[in-house]
Amino acid sequence: MKALGEVFSKLVEKIRGVSYIDEATLQELSREIQRALLKADVPLDMVKTFTENAVKRMREEKPPAGIPPREYVLYILYDELVKLLGGEQPAEFKPVKKPYLVLLLGVEGSGKTTTAAKLARYLVKRGYRVGLVETDTIRPAAFDQLKQLAEKIGVPFYGERDSKDAVEIARRGVQNFKNMDVVIIDTAGRHKNEEALLQEVKMIYEAVNPDEVILVIDATVGKLAAAQAEAFMKYLPIHSVIITKMDSTARGGGALAAVIKTGARVKFIGVGEDVDEFDLFNPRKFVARVLGMGDLDALVEKIKAVFEEEKVLQEIESGRLDLLTFKKQIEGLLKLGPLSKVLQLLPGGFAAKISEEQVELSQKNLKKWYAILSSMTIEELKNPDILNASRIRRIALGAGVTPKDVKEMLTVYENLKKMSKTLKRQLRMRIPK
């Protein structure tokens, strides 16, 4: 979502730089809002309505006591964007029967097969038993792609490489997974004008009677997402939508707005290539991140889950900040996911301010340090004082780095050790027990 965040960061900076809100300022902000929304590929009629509503509120509403006018203007922008993207209520995915059948649709290239695996991974992490069914008989690579992804995430897979009957594959796949909690059925990618393929997916729908039909849409299509959704809606009911590739384009905002305009519910967004880079869509948190307000709730929950699992907090609080604890901390940070995604959760627009090169370097350093620590013996991890030149050379060789790299990591460790009391206080404030 960095690309979308960059579109709005200039608008937010403009608002925060305003000392007095008069009519001239409102007219200027109106133009800036329209410019940002059009860059995000929001449909023109929605841009006009949004701008009129937002500026009207900015003109007529008075900020509460103690709130600077510019901060209240920013709040109005946030509030109107949340409304534009579906309102305060976050999406939910709760299978209500067993097996709960999910049918995935989408045009070719929308990321549908990868999304099938991401959804499966999301559900498995929440305790559901999931089966994946591949019915794409048009694209030969689809079978192998989903089979490999299923193996990667540890989910059972059903497909028939040589069959050309997608309807029968779907029917047999559902029967094969009748004892699962959720069955996800992937279908061939279709063009919205391909009558025969659209009829085929309708036949699959009638054969298996899915509990939920999810349309997968690529964010890069922007406002054209509405046409895709409406085309599929002519053939069968669309219960919800997943927007993919939100991390790679500024047009994702337009795709979201266009889909919501059709009455469809956006349930998930894909925010990266990894199977774990997949989130339930929460308009409030999404807008906060796009505007650079961050999503500290999400960040704290991520950190809490990782560090509670490793029991690192207790070790820091007991004063045992040795290299073994340091290794667990780095492992925990790596489990949070790519640093670029973590930065998007921070307020102040950090993700937009830090270059991709800096983020990539930090990520590489964490991985390098983890390799160094993994090359040490338990004795060395627990007693860093025994690390002499000979041991450092051996560790560097085992980690595929230079002795200088090892020494630099040890310097970072020593600095962290000195700061452990401050770190302890910060963690206690951020991560309640």
From Swiss-Prot:
Specify which residues bind GTP according to the UniProt entry for this protein. Answer: 106-113, 186-190, 244-247
Catalysed reaction per UniProt?
GTP + H2O = GDP + phosphate + H(+)
Q: Which GO terms describe its biological process?
A: SRP-dependent cotranslational protein targeting to membrane
Q: What InterPro entries does the annotation carry?
A: AAA+_ATPase, P-loop_NTPase, Signal_recog_part_SRP54_M_sf, Signal_recog_particl_SRP54_hlx, Signal_recog_particle_SRP54_M, SRP/SRP_N, SRP54, SRP54_GTPase_dom
Spell out the molecular function terms from Gene Ontology: 7S RNA binding; ATP hydrolysis activity; GTP binding; GTPase activity
Which SMART domains does this UniProt record tie to the protein? AAA, SRP54, SRP54_N
> Is Nucleotide-binding one of the keywords?
yes
Compartments where found: Cytoplasm
Keyword flag Hydrolase: yes
Q: Which UniProt keywords apply?
A: Cytoplasm, GTP-binding, Hydrolase, Nucleotide-binding, Ribonucleoprotein, RNA-binding, Signal recognition particle
Query: E.C. number, please?
Result: 3.6.5.4
Q: What is known of its domains?
A: Composed of three domains: the N-terminal N domain, which is responsible for interactions with the ribosome, the central G domain, which binds GTP, and the C-terminal M domain, which binds the RNA and the signal sequence of the RNC.
Q: Which family does it belong to?
A: Belongs to the GTP-binding SRP family. SRP54 subfamily.
UniProt function note: Involved in targeting and insertion of nascent membrane proteins into the cytoplasmic membrane. Binds to the hydrophobic signal sequence of the ribosome-nascent chain (RNC) as it emerges from the ribosomes. The SRP-RNC complex is then targeted to the cytoplasmic membrane where it interacts with the SRP receptor FtsY.
On assembly, the entry states: Part of the signal recognition particle protein translocation system, which is composed of SRP and FtsY. Archaeal SRP consists of a 7S RNA molecule of 300 nucleotides and two protein subunits: SRP54 and SRP19.
Protein's recorded name: Signal recognition particle 54 kDa protein
Q: Which gene encodes it?
A: srp54
